[in-house]
Amino acid sequence: MTTGKLLDETATLLIGKNILSVKPGKRRLTIVNGGQTGVDRAALDSAMHLMLPCRGWCPNERWAEDAAIAPNYPLQECGSPTPAVRTELNTIDSDGTLVLSRGNPQDGTPLTVERAKLHGKPTLELNLDETPDVAAFWAWISKHDIRILNIGGPRESFAPGAVYTPTRKILDLILDPTR
């Protein structure tokens, strides 16, 4: 398995019954987060769509603002009903954090950035209203040797209908190791 290793040449991976060609300078990242609506949910959906490993910690009873997090998301309950606990654990369990937001981060997003800095984890912030620089993203991943990427940002209620979709488009673009 090539997870965690930057590739110097195109490699072919067999994942289940699917064959993927991973481009040079990219790797199959593992995505972690807490499964909240908005950015978290888009990140997990993107990871599953791209056949990237994903996991994370979520509050007890799989709490999210819309309902209990569906069982198809591979998350573990963190032993606390407090979202801040899962934020802490996901930050600790990752090599770096990607934050997607608009303007000044709100909700639990500033806590995610604060926890990443506290634990010495590199953080990259992307604006949901801008087209990301894919090469710059992968250069950041390479520079910090990130294998497990925590992805966070606002809940869907922060801007109903305007968080999940742009996040999903951005992540489908930048996380795809075959592009």
Regions found by a protein language model. Name each.
Residues 2-4:
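Extreme N-terminal basic, low-complexity initiation segments
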Residues 6-148, 153-177:
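Acidic/glycine-enriched connector segments
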